[in-house]
């Protein structure tokens, strides 16, 4: 029987390949995800372990707000370095400063940037090479007024040793002479689009506004000294708000942020692999059902010559297992290619990732194979069971068809119940009270799964009415071919329904994403329109990095400027939790209009040294009223009590302010290196070309500070959302492609099945052209049925979700929805190419005799 | 495997009635038919379209169940057998030859012939298998696939497949119905030969007088009843009998 199963597969190569492709893509996504994330993790591991080369212990600042914080740690006094060097167990120690917004300015006057990656600046100390994780490619290490930059950036931007380059960190852009080009470590590690700029310590301190301060001290111990002893000794001289860790643990602490990023990325991508596999399982089940229906006589013959039901079942399951194995193996290796593609995808969409070569772990192989084979076999169970119900007598009956399943007549109720249960679970997950985050996700996931199953099964009942409507244009313009196409689509509603269902899932998700994105965008736009009364906004070139407070200063002296108001942000420990504290310059009432629950616009101008305004939710959960005290601890450890002066209600789309907002003067006193997230500017006469030019000129010394009109600001702030949206679309396209194979497969099988009928049609005068058109129309009708159900379902899901989530409003991405329907039509046309060609090529005589 | 003595009864049917459908649309395809199939003989069932001859064969072979009446094959009543027991019965006692051959297209001629044994998990008797291929003239064609064989050759493969397990009885359903007349003659010769050389009990349903003429006994069915029962006769007699029934 095994041989028989293998022969059956081999004898139907095209069908097998088309069916298997559905699984190949799903498995490729899973294996590609693992390969991608493993490669990223390993690249980050390499980066962090080489950063702490030769380092036995590292001293850093410590945030008083959050112990686990690894970024924006307060710098400490440089004098510590001398004390550490004098410790008996210390062989060598160097101090350094770093800055994550050290922008290299290109010859076009713009910040050099590759896909959202950081712009790292730091001090280098070539006198202590044991600590140096960089190596020179050409040139020499920097002296005062010089810089070394990474050779990748230099190569891309044609920068040579001896050139002058402007660099903007915490002040105006300053010209530096490029003394050398460096690379990270000694290997060919790609650091993923980050730009590097290294300076001597004094220059770096000045550039980063950390004069007399250090961010880190790295220590090498004397021979024979234990790490524990070294750490204990260092601890004895540590001032408050500093900490020491071993080199290894410092490396893993630094890596923890990227670790959580890669594990998020992994889960995120696996979800799409799961979706593709889910869709693939529909395609497999459907293709196998059709194939098995066509093999009715074969199974019946086997029964008459003594095959038992169990043997038939086994034979079909062996077929699907072998197909699953082959598809999974192919998918596994295709995943390597896909991982490469994903690197490029993320790169082109603005998320460049580090890469040290593709990594295929054993776990990837196991998971990809197990998942691929399991999905195939599970999807084939139902068709296999139906094959066992073929009665032996079907061997002697012509045109024998599969008996309907035992539960066929309950299908409508069953699938309806399934979908209803799904909606109930989803609604419970969304609106039920007292659920944990995991609980919510479990119910939502379960609900979505049930809904998709239910709707997919129910879709066969929608085929006839939908095909009547969707096939009408084809019937009107396509003549007989159009009419026949519509009837063909309707004559096996179950088949058309499950073929369309595969596409339905992909389109439902795409629609859901588009609706949510549109909702987020319009709630954000609504918030900007409601809140901002300024004419201009200034942000970093990449729209999200903070900019030095000094950047906006030159705007103040531009004639006609009536207000320049910066908004800064930092963390503080308030009521035993970490909260964002924002601060605003005087003049806030001129650029922002808040809805006040307590207080009024005048609060902006009367914050003084300790005043604060808070948002409604924060006030409510901490029982605050005007006059309530807010005790806060800032990262440097300083304590400060603020007093509530006003309470405001932010719009659904959010506001520039955190839960607690204070005056910028107070903020600058409490926080080292204050930076602005936004600067809002008002001008006499509003937005005019003259004003724009004047502001651009004034801020020319700060290339990273971008002057935008408020409408540009809106668009730019939403740009990140568009990038995310594009990534989601590309990933969901995978499952749409899988369903496309499903359509191709169904049509090819249908053409086989209708060979004799096609021959008859040709014999009575149908042209090849008309045959092709007929198949094409049927394909488009099937695709459109999937699109209509999918888009409708996506809208329903989105409406439910939006009803639950406060910060998204209901908005209709009409353009996108129309586009999705058009994509479905295109998909239908694409899917029909091969089957239509096969159908048109049939030899009339042979087709008539085909049995 | 033939465990029935020659000239004994291998298949017996009593008062078979088969009604298709219910109520107003009910059709009585077979009406109180009784018969015994003698071992080692070739029995032909003749009759015009709709006479119930195919229904009779389906019932005798256990492919369909009678509305009333009893059947036993090799002495075993089959009315109460479940699917597994019926499968076992088919393996041991029944071979089939079909009008449209029903070969598996992906298997070679040899593999098709051996399939019943493969399914039953048995090893072929090499000598018997060689003799069978020789007899059916397939020795040179054993590695060919059905698509590479002519219709006659395909039916030879099917006959060899039916014989390979030495079943108690072979049921042939219009074995020449899809073949030209010259090839039909060869196939009929082969079937006759299998009865003469191997003592293979065979029941053949046909509407071809020439086919019926090779049988040891010819039953005529009309309107669901046996109307004539002839011993071995030539084609002319058969045709005359057919006309007499007056279809």
Residue locations for each model-derived region?
Chain A
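Hydrophobic, regular-secondary-structure patches
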Residues: 16, 20-118, 155, 216, ...
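Alpha-helical transmembrane segments
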Residues: 27-58, 266, 289, 338-347, ...
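Short beta-strand boundary microenvironments
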Residues: 115-156, 553-558, 562-563, 567-629, ...
